[in-house]
Amino acid sequence: MTDSGEIDPQTAEEKVTDAQTAALSLSNLSTARRNEALTAIADTIERNVDRILEANAADVADAEKQVDAGEYTQAFVDRLTLSTSKIESIAEMVRSVAEQDDPLGETLTARELDDDLNLYKVTVPIGVIGTVFESRPDALVQISALSLKSGNAVILKGGSEAERSNRVLYNCILEATPEVPSGWAQLIEAREDVQTLLEMDDAVDLIMPRGSSSFVQYVQDNTSIPVLGHTEGVCHVYVDSEADLEMATAVAYDAKVQYPAVCNAVETLLVHESVAPSFLSQMMKQYRDAGVEIRGDERTQSIVDTESNISEEIIAATEADWTTEYGDRIVSIAVVDSLTDAIDHINMYGSKHTESILTQDDNRAEQFMRAVDAASVFHNASTRFADGFRFGLGAEVGISTGKIHARGPVGLDGLTTYKYHLEGDGQQVATYAGSDAKPFDHAEFDETWPVRNDDG
Amino acid sequence: MTDSGEIDPQTAEEKVTDAQTAALSLSNLSTARRNEALTAIADTIERNVDRILEANAADVADAEKQVDAGEYTQAFVDRLTLSTSKIESIAEMVRSVAEQDDPLGETLTARELDDDLNLYKVTVPIGVIGTVFESRPDALVQISALSLKSGNAVILKGGSEAERSNRVLYNCILEATPEVPSGWAQLIEAREDVQTLLEMDDAVDLIMPRGSSSFVQYVQDNTSIPVLGHTEGVCHVYVDSEADLEMATAVAYDAKVQYPAVCNAVETLLVHESVAPSFLSQMMKQYRDAGVEIRGDERTQSIVDTESNISEEIIAATEADWTTEYGDRIVSIAVVDSLTDAIDHINMYGSKHTESILTQDDNRAEQFMRAVDAASVFHNASTRFADGFRFGLGAEVGISTGKIHARGPVGLDGLTTYKYHLEGDGQQVATYAGSDAKPFDHAEFDETWPVRNDDG
């Protein structure tokens, strides 16, 4: 392979244009060829463990200095750090992508418009996908693997903190895929190259930013290319009057404590007033033991004050707390009068990510799930389940809080679009227009494109 | 009903905010209630034919003056003009929308993640849809009907030339829908209100502009809200070496002449060199008789020159011709050496709208259909079939040349998104994480949400 420190010296614009050219032939690479290429990527990564670890160690060493300087958190450096077992699991992830069903060439509908005039709606790749991500070097491999599986060309922009790790991984990917149309995966590194990418709306079909809310917002404000990303995860757990309080406590604990830094962790608990005294006294103890800071509205404060077995002083929640993604061991709590009030609170302050109701009453659960406007609405389950792997989508390219194209955890399906294939026999629209227009049949039937006749 | 000349004096911002509130309850209006409201709209429009015609006559009279002044074309005024039969067909269109299958509440997939932990992907409305359209007053009714059927609130901005017609139709719609959450349909009229709409990215989920390419481009460049629209229809017909030339001539004639002003009319013919002399001599005569102006590349010019039976002088096509949507009785023609050259020409100059190959060779057709990057790819059929009604989608809200969310003719499906519903039994993610993680089942099954247990 080429020296791990080298990448192609083309400009970002040339790279994007090459990706655009590659996308046209990539879309027609057979399932077998795409899967073979994925397997080769996994093998090449495993063969180059030492080289990857060496490059990563240099990135990590530099990042550690930034922790001392107060620039990075230790958690950030942890996400950056690779190990032999982590690299093995990256290779394993690539193999699992190879094993997934082909998302391409699926006939979604087949419809006879008239005799010998048949319309097929068939899944195809989107084209060129621009991605910007941070920290974890495994993101580069995951995004590349999902793009290849779904027949898309991809522009990869990783964080500067992972530059050496990303270069080695990128070169492993290129080395493993000589059979894939050259140019299908492009690494860009400079900050100003992101601007170039965002401006190339003729060449790039979709931008997927993964990073801070403000960065995603910046991308949305600075491109006319469609953006798939999530801006915030202000998720709620609502403990209903009909909740099983033991279950509610366990779920609210998991939703906050199991991994507080992620977007599907809960930020605000809403508690029905009828169960608030009893629920809060249980919940507070558990959160306190886990070191979770509580910010409560006035009713929460007063309930906790009057529950003699709780010694906490509850910090007063302000308006800002209801829209804050803490990403940390902090939770805000509000007591509500009714199911409707809980729904209204969520629709006003939530970020349309993931919302959960705890109740033993199925009708109340259904009302909540219908009325709350969010990508994922849960009944008696932790918000932390909102994840592509847990949802059974295989690997995920991200979670979307937008409502267009793909919503919630996005898997391979979100990287495809469709194309209409019409098979005719010389039909003209004039036949179906005017006063003696021939009517259409519009009958759906079971057939997949391409249709193969026995006589060839 | 209120006086047809009055509309609500709220600001555009208030209207959009009200639509946002309405959208939350609109999404839960039952199928029957939405269909009843659609039927009431059709009835109310029919009851108010005289009032609609009166308002329309005033719009048309003003527009006629602009024709004399050279501002509008007669075709523009024709599109603006309503008649009793046109109004009846508008009412009929609304009834046909009522009759279509409900696009909402459909369970797209059901997957067991684990015992008593079931995930349902269910179709839901998008939310608030902003639309900007021109000329035809029937567009206002069509867009409103499709939005209501799909549970979306809608902001309607029509052209000033149809202001009086649009006001009456809008008031008919409001009068007919007192049972629909108030605020679901909002009419805005001022040019500056469009800017307000484009800026309200927290409240508006999708913008659908219908109009000139430059207007759609303007919208894309001036909002961070997702845009569904089409910028150009530069469609091609490729006459292959294996084409049935009689069929090819008939299809190329229909694709250009049957309705040249629309986006799915052909703009460029590509002709394989082996059939060019024979095809062009037939085609030229037919186009000449229909008054179609021909712009040919050098090879087309020389072939036509040497074909003694053609008296035409062919205008030389310039580079600009290959990317021009004439929308008129003008066609450009290029002779190509091969199927691959035709594909390359289309992928370089086309607008990803609709492309058709004429050939009797199924393998060559398949190669073309796979390799051409367009929303609709046709084999032996006129490009003019690219249309929601002809495709059997029912009414269409527009044709998308983008690749994200909805592509080609967009029907009710394009106005929906989905929501993940997870039904659990108190599950925590901690159970499925770490070294002794419980594995997921991820088994798909047939069931629709909401699941009703017999015991309530």
UniProtKB/Swiss-Prot annotation, chains A, B:
It comes from the Archaea. PROSITE patterns: PROA. The keyword Metal-binding does not apply. One of its GO terms (molecular function) is glutamate-5-semialdehyde dehydrogenase activity. Its EC number is 1.2.1.41. It is an enzyme of class 1 (oxidoreductase). GO terms for biological process: L-proline biosynthetic process. InterPro entries: Ald_DH/histidinol_DH, Ald_DH_C, Ald_DH_N, Aldehyde_DH_dom, G-glutamylP_reductase_CS, Glu-5-SA_DH, GPR_dom. Keywords: Amino-acid biosynthesis, Cytoplasm, NADP, Oxidoreductase, Proline biosynthesis. It is found in: Cytoplasm. One of its GO terms (cellular component) is cytoplasm. Belongs to the gamma-glutamyl phosphate reductase family. Catalyzes the NADPH-dependent reduction of L-glutamate 5-phosphate into L-glutamate 5-semialdehyde and phosphate. The product spontaneously undergoes cyclization to form 1-pyrroline-5-carboxylate. This is Gamma-glutamyl phosphate reductase. It comes from Haloquadratum walsbyi (strain DSM 16790 / HBSQ001).
